C-alpha cells in the first residue's frame, strides 16, 4: 500500500510539473507574439481618405520610433509585426493637427477604426507661402534651396530638380556649378555618396525624396579640426537633406523603357540606331547606424525631356581641350552598377565605402567649318567630317574612415582604386580651300587604339588639438598616387597636296607610369581669444614616364616616331598667416612662397636631352581670406591666393602627333610650370520678409607663364603647332549677378534676373608668314627645337628669329537671362529669355575681329490632375547672328510627355524633339582660327516607360517586400 501511495504521489507531481511547463510556455508566447495594427485616416470635414499621412508608433514612455509607415491612396494603414504592449499612436500630415493617442495592443489584430484629422488653417497658409516663396536662403556660408519651391514632375530625378534652381548648372559629365563655381562633392544627409561620381546622385535619386539642397562653402575636415586654412582646404559641398519619411526605412524604384527613333541625321552624322531602351534600379535603406544604396542602370537613350540646346564654347587653343571638344556630342550606350554604404558600426569611427562599374559605348560624328587667319594673307577654309566609336569599362573602389570624436584627435584615411580599359576608332576626312574655293589639300585618316590602366591613390591625415593650450594644433596630411598604363594604336592615312598623294601606316606600343607623394604639415599657435599665427609647409613630388615605340607597316621599327620621356616635378610651398576667427566670421592674411622644379629627360633617335635640371622657379603671392555673415541674411566672402600648375604629359612629349595629317604637333620639353593668382569676391543677401535673394560674385585670374600654342602653316596649307609659355601674363575677370523674388500675397509668381559677364586678355604667338613644315619622314626633334626654340630659354622663338610674333587677344562675353514662373497647386508655367553676345579683338590681325549674338526663348508647362495624370511640355527656340553660312539658321526644340500613376506603378510616354530640329553646336574662337562644328545627336524619338515604386516611395507598399528588404541590413 505504501508503494502504491508513493507511486501515485510521484505521478501527480509529474503531471503537475508538466502542467506548470505548459502554462509558462503559454505566457511567454503571449508576451512575445506579434500582431497587426490597422486603421483608416480621413479628413474630419469631408471624410475623404488622406493618402501619404505619416503613421508611427512609440513604446509607452519612450521617444524611439519602432514602426513607421504611410497611408495609401485609400487612406488605409497596415502596420505588421508589432509586439504586444503599450504604444502611443502618432498620425501626422502637413496642414492638419497631429493626432496622438495611447493604446494597449493585446489582440491578434488591432483595428483602430477611423482616425479623423482636423485641418490647421494657419499651418496650411504658412506652408504654402513658405514652400513657394522662400526658395533660396542664405545662412552664413550656406545656400539653402527649398525643393518644394521648384515644381518638377513625379518622375523627375535630382538632375531635373537642380536644373530648375537659380544659379545651378549641370554639365553632360555630371559636374555641377553654383554661380559659376564647381561643386567638389555631393553628400546625402552629410554622408559621402559614391565619392567622386556626381552622376550617381544626379541620375539615380528621385527628386521627390529631397526636402532641401544645401550648398556649403566650408573647410575640409582637416582644416575644420585644426583651425588652419590653406589654399587647398576649402571645398564646396552639395548636401541633400531628405524628407523625414525617407530618413528611416527602405525605399526605391525600378524602371523599364522602350522606344523608337525613326530618322537618320543628315550629312553623315548618324547611325542605324532605331530601337531604344533603358532601365534603372535604385534601392536605398537607412537606419540609425547604416545607409545602404544600390543602383543599376543601362540605356541607349535617355527619357524624353531636356533634349538639350546648342552648346557654345569659346576656348583658348589647347591640345587637350581640342581633343575633348571632338568627343562632345554623339549617341551613347551606357551601363552602371554600384553600391554605397555609410556605417557607424566600427566603434568610434564613421566609415563609407563604395564600389561601382561603369560601361560606355559611344558613336560620335562631327561636321566642322574652320576659318584660319594668316597674317598678311587671305584666310584658309577647312571643312571636315569626323566619325568614330569609343568603348570604356571602369571599376572604382573607394573607402573612407573618419574618427568620430574629434575634440582632441583627428584621423582620416581615404584610399581609392581605379581599373580602366578602353578602345576607340575614328575616321577623319577634310579638305582645305583658299578664298576662291580652290582645293589646296585634303586627308582621309583613320586611327584605332586600346589601353588599360590602374591607379591607386589615397589620403591619410592626422592631427592633435589643444596641445598644452586651448586651440593650439598640429596636423599632418599625406597624399599618394601610383598609376600604370599600357596601350597600342594604329594610324593609317592618305594625304594629298594637289596631285601628290602620301600614304602612311604606323603602329604604336605605348606605356606610361606615374608616382606622386605629397603632404602638408601645419601648426597653429593661438594668442588672445580669437587670434592665431599659422605656419603651413606643403610639398609634392611627382614623376611621370612615357614610352612610345613606333613600327612601320612591315613591322620594322621607326625611330623617328619613337620616344621616351620622364618628367620629375617638385613643388615646395610655404605660407605664414595671421588668423582671426570669431563664430562664423574669419579674417586670414599672410604671404606664401612657391618653389617649383620641373625636370624633363627625353630620348629620341638615340640621343638624350635634359632640361630644367636643378632649375628652381620662385613665385610669391599674398594670401587673404575674409568671411563675414550678418544677422540680416547677408554673407560676404573675399579671397586671394596663388597656385602652381604642371604642364600636361602630352605637352612635353618629344614626338610627332600625326593622327590628323593636316594638324601636326609635337611637345615642348622646355615648358615651365605656370603660376596663377586668383581673386574672388562674393556677396549674398536673403530678405526673409519678402523671400527675395540676390547674389553677386566676381572672380579674377592672372596667369604667369601660361601655356598656349604657337602655330603656322606651310606652303601646302598644313597646320603645325607647338605648346609654349607666354611671356606676358593672361588675365580674366568674370562677374555674376542673380536676383529672384516671389510676388503677390500667396507668392505664386516668381520673377528672376541674371547676368554673367567675362572679360579676358591673353597672349598668342603666330607666324608672320608661312614656314617650313616638320619633316615627317625623318623628324629630328632636337634639330627642330634648336631652330624653332633656340636655347633652353627660347632665345630664337621669343626674339622673333624663328618667324613668330606676339599677338594680344581681348574677348568679352555677356550672358543675360530673365525669368518668370507662375505656380498653382497642380499647375506651373515658366518663361525664360536669354541673350548672349561674344566679341573678340586681335592686335596682330584686326580683320579677324568677331561679333556673335545668340538668343534663346524657353517655355515649360507642367500640369498634374487629381487622378494621377501628369502632362509636361518644354519648348526652346534659338536664333543666331554673325556666324558663318549654314550656322545662322534658327531652330526649335519641343518635348512632350504624359504619365499616369496607378498605385505603385507609373506609366509614361514621351516624345523628344517633336519637330526634329535638335542640333549640338560648338563655337571656338581664338587668335588663330574660328571654328563651328555640329555633332551627332539623337533627333526625334519616342519612349514608353513603366516604373514601380516600392518601400516608402509606394503609398500602397507591400509589407512582405518591406520586411524582406529590412532584413538585408
Segments the model singles out, each with a brief description of its role:
Residues 831-899:
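C-terminal beta-barrel architecture of Gram-negative outer-membrane proteins
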Residues 385, 516-518, 561-563, 666-668, ...:
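Outer membrane beta-barrel strand-and-loop segments of large Gram-negative receptors
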Residues 59-64, 86, 90-102:
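A short, solvent-exposed loop/turn motif at the edges and junctions
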Residues 226-228, 265-268, 296, 305-313, ...:
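Outer-membrane beta-barrel translocator domains and adjoining extracellular loop/strand segments
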Residues 20-34, 44, 56, 73-76, ...:
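Membrane-proximal, glycine/serine-rich, low-complexity loop/turn segments characteristic
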Residues 532-635, 843:
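Signature of Gram-negative outer-membrane beta-barrel scaffolds
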Residues 60-76:
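Short, acidic Ser/Thr/Gly-rich low-complexity loop/linker segments typical of extracellular
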